[in-house]
Amino acid sequence: MGAASGQRGRWPLSPPLLMLSLLLLLLLPPSPAPALDPGLQPGNFSADEAGAQLFADSYNSSAEVVMFQSTAASWAHDTNITEENARLQEEAALINQEFAEVWGKKAKELYESIWQNFTDQKLRRIIGSVQTLGPANLPLTQRLQYNSLLSNMSRIYSTGKVCFPNKTATCWSLDPELTNILASSRNYAKVLFAWEGWHDAVGIPLRPLYQDFTALSNEAYRQDGFSDTGAYWRSWYESPSFEESLEHLYHQVEPLYLNLHAFVRRALHRRYGDKYINLRGPIPAHLLGDMWAQSWENIYDMVVPFPDKPNLDVTSTMVQKGWNATHMFRVAEEFFTSLGLSPMPPEFWAESMLEKPADGREVVCHASAWDFYNRKDFRIKQCTRVTMDQLSTVHHEMGHVQYYLQYKDLHVSLRRGANPGFHEAIGDVLALSVSTPAHLHKIGLLDRVANDIESDINYLLKMALEKIAFLPFGYLVDQWRWGVFSGRTPPSRYNYDWWYLRTKYQGICPPVARNETHFDAGAKFHIPSVTPYIRYFVSFVLQFQFHQALCKEAGHQGPLHQCDIYQSTKAGAKLQQVLQAGCSRPWQEVLKDLVGSDALDASALMEYFQPVSQWLQEQNQRNGEVLGWPEYQWRPPLPDNYPEGIDLETDEAKANRFVEEYDRTAKVLWNEYAEANWHYNTNITIEGSKILLQKNKEVSNHTLKYGTWAKTFDVSNFQNSTIKRIIKKVQNVDRAVLPPNELEEYNQILLDMETTYSVANVCYTNGTCLSLEPDLTNIMATSRKYEELLWVWKSWRDKVGRAILPFFPKYVDFSNKIAKLNGYSDAGDSWRSSYESDDLEQDLEKLYQELQPLYLNLHAYVRRSLHRHYGSEYINLDGPIPAHLLGNMWAQTWSNIYDLVAPFPSAPSIDATEAMIKQGWTPRRIFKEADNFFTSLGLLPVPPEFWNKSMLEKPTDGREVVCHASAWDFYNGKDFRIKQCTSVNMEELVIAHHEMGHIQYFMQYKDLPVTFREGANPGFHEAIGDVLALSVSTPKHLHSLNLLSSEGSGYEHDINFLMKMALDKIAFIPFSYLIDQWRWRVFDGSITKENYNQEWWSLRLKYQGLCPPVPRSQGDFDPGSKFHVPANVPYIRYFISFIIQFQFHEALCRAAGHTGPLYKCDIYQSKEAGKLLADAMKLGYSKQWPEAMKIITGQPNMSASAIMNYFKPLTEWLVTENRRHGETLGWPEYTWTPNTARAEGSLPESSRVNFLGMYLEPQQARVGQWVLLFLGVALLVATVGLAHRLYNIHNHHSLRRPHRGPQFGSEVELRHS
């Protein structure tokens, strides 16, 4: 809103604009007051009406000279703020005040007692004005102080800057930078920073000055007979009931404002959400598109009722058509001349400042119109921007100039509006026509005019955002100042009362805490510039009264809001009468001549907005909106990371375009990477590793590029949760954050570790070598020879763990650096973030503690069985179990020793392996059956690419491959594969269903953005296949596949089945829990590299109750013998998956209509169960995992109750059995280690056995045994006892080392780029 800073009324007694303009910046040290030219002093006049007329004429000619000089000095200063110009302005101000003093005192001396009786009304008004001295009443020292205060207040405001946090070189001025931010930015934090910065930078230093100004100003006007400055300002309206009239007007428009406020608040709530918008509270003051929330049209795009209708903001069209500031003023001038009014004089175009200078000058940018009082020089000062809003401001300012032109021949004291509101209303009246779609079409800014109710509502809402939104602000500013001047608002309550009024009338609140150190009123130009503000409230009512009358004069038919008086000379003639009167007559008379009434009335305004008023009421009633702000004390929280994150992008449309581009490019690149990775994993070669590293680099470059881009968005207030979630995920650039040389080194370390693991083998002394798959795995599963198992166990770790150890500390350093650069405390923190839970570690510990009693009972029972097989030399019934005796390289699952621990050995077998082999099952047949299970649930069959491209068996062509089972998504929506060195056995049948579960997950979410193509959390992906495997493993289902002769029944059969399942599921729980317990502590530094292995075995002892069968040292690295450690695959996912798969199973069984024990449930062919699974899988990662959990189970939490329910019969049997045998639960003799004197270091050949340290053929060994049998029994027993004792001592002091993740297929390594 442009204030007519140069417009003057009863000069020199109207402080608002001239006095301010006179005095602006930088006060210099006081100097002697310049003397008034004697020729400008008053002469001698008679003390009668005739003498008064001569007095007035003489005053007029002298005043024009003084006023021109003072206005010129102010103009020079405002358009070039320098110390010299400030000094010259000071001198002109003092001359001005001296002139006012001598002429005012003369008027009082001669006419104070008689002027009100003059017959000439104009003369009465002139003399009454001249004898009001204002600041000229003050003694010279106080006058200098008063001028200094005005100058300093103006300096503070005009030179105020807001500097970017921690970047002092980047500072924003109010115009254009801060104004543009408030108008166009939708970044909550950035707008807040601009708002807070401006209010602090300007308001705080103004506060003490304003207090002193108030005291001096009141003292000055009291000497003129007014109670305070506010009373003087109100006197211009010549109405004893002025304040009551204003209150009446406000109540007329209040219902419309309340409906507009509620509607806008709802729209802001859609944009900013509950965090920042309370639908029953005030609106944060910075969100309404304007520094002062006085007009809201800049947020029209957020609140437009019908977005599909033509855009009524023609800013872009103005820019496209090459409009500039001068053209905007020419267009405004042409409107006035089309009404028959005056064109701008040459001086206007020659001397005005229509744009912000580009030469670096400091200027006062606030738009203002200037009268130089020589009847020909009129100017506008405006830092014009090419926008529709500024086009209205241009018409507003030119309305002031037109007023100047029309009353320029009046006495200087009458050259002002009929009242101050008149002057503000004139330009706005024309702007009401200019802003109509019809007029915008006429001047080429709108292609067509839509005549329909929706377009009308759009237009009227846009106008309401400017006009109606302003009314409470226009009303309250001087309510506050009048309270300050009268003393009702003391300095101790300046800010409190300011915000009380802003909340009371506007329904807004400060967005940050404010107190009495602040002075937020001072952040508005008119406060430090001492420009009365109620004129704007009055003008916003008057302009609609004028508009209504002029439209009638122009012959307009139809709704008032569609009226355009352009080219109506009749309307122009009517308006000219108002302008030419100046303030020579009471404003009530002037108003009556134009509109037929002498009262301010809002009925014309209400008529104009009637359609949108009704529409707003209907919308608010439909939405159940609260009118007003009953929760008036509510305040919004500060944004996270404020103010550092203020420069982030918050435009959701831009974010959406980013997401679309990221998704499009990522699909292509991730497909290429997956192909290169597949090629390497299925044919390990140097050339393949080079290609993979190159693709890895390309993925990292892409990740870094788009991750860096994603970090420019502040998603905290995005209403589109999908966009928000994608960007937050993309912001984590993972390893791509490293510098290129370090990234290359890190990738090489990962490749070297995984390759070392994948190609490793162990060899007999005769050169025969064994790979992990299938050779070593088969030995660990089937051999019951202690020494052979020990040799395999130790040899694998010697070969793999020790080779990986040199890479690992550097890998840890890089992993932590990556995590920290991505905003995490360490790599463990980064891994845990995938679960989006602050309580993850506590929740996992709780789950583990719930399952521990069952594990302890299983451990004790298995230990007793192993003791029966291996004897007390190798098994201590009160100690840990040697880690190599449990049928698996890592002792993670124990099902391979089922034959040693079967509760009821005579019961029918529940292992389908023999039947599978007899029936000629192949790996392909295994996967076909798994595919059939999924399709029986109504789920998707695997596509042809799966069968054509998967590697389902270990190649026989000599290729080195990564045998570890894994499922692969190639990100093109049709190519999904499994890589598995499948053997034909029941375990592999279960594994196949696990891997196919991953494939099904891939297929279900294939149409989501690539960022969401993963499990709801990593444990979900692992659980899906295992859920089906729980059905596949049932005797009922195996019988249906003709793999068991019967479904089996009876207690013994059930306990055997549950035991076999427990050896897989329960035995695995502590192992899956401890691996990442170890890694998290490595990452956070609590486990140092010197203690890697010791702490590994401490955890394996603590949780699993296992010990190494041979001493371990710092040179060993047993965690590295587990695939997931060198492969950098987090492992806690498997612990979680083993919990939630039973929750899923229980829920799916319920959906399938199963009745009976949970462990007997088979969901095969249940479409109802399949639908639950599909609905959860289709979500991918698009929602937080509790939502997916709720779809399947009906509740959002992880729980061990389902798994405990599943194994309840076995738990009860184990407890009874262990009590019967007096088993110790746990391992109180935790320092015990097995006697391995004979076996340690043994290195068998393929056909030879170790006998007393010699490598003999089996026949020779047997002969040797008989020869030595009788001679050596006693010695042998003694030797064994001694060796046992010595090695107990030795092993007590040995170090321990870690290993990783299950080799069996329940741990797929997901290939996500």
Swiss-Prot record:
Membrane topology of the entry: Single-pass type I membrane protein
GO cellular component, as recorded: basal plasma membrane; brush border membrane; cytoplasm; endosome; external side of plasma membrane; extracellular exosome; extracellular region; extracellular space
Catalytic reaction(s) noted: Release of a C-terminal dipeptide, oligopeptide-|-Xaa-Yaa, when Xaa is not Pro, and Yaa is neither Asp nor Glu. Thus, conversion of angiotensin I to angiotensin II, with increase in vasoconstrictor activity, but no action on angiotensin II; angiotensin I + H2O = L-histidyl-L-leucine + angiotensin II; bradykinin + H2O = L-Phe-L-Arg + bradykinin(1-7); substance P + H2O = substance P(1-9) + L-Leu-L-Met-NH2
Family: Belongs to the peptidase M2 family.
Compartment annotation: Cell membrane; Cytoplasm
Underlying gene: Ace
Disulfide bonds: 163-171, 365-383, 551-563, 763-769, 963-981, 1149-1161
Extracellular side: 36-1265
SUPFAM superfamilies: Metalloproteases ('zincins'), catalytic domain
TM region positions: 1266-1282
Side of membrane Cytoplasmic, spans: 1283-1313
PROSITE patterns: PEPTIDASE_M2 (PS52011), ZINC_PROTEASE (PS00142)
GO BP terms: amyloid-beta metabolic process; angiogenesis involved in coronary vascular morphogenesis; angiotensin maturation; angiotensin-activated signaling pathway; animal organ regeneration; arachidonate secretion; bradykinin catabolic process; cell proliferation in bone marrow
UniProt-recorded name of the protein: Angiotensin-converting enzyme
Principal localisation: membrane
Residues binding chloride 2: 797, 1096, 1100
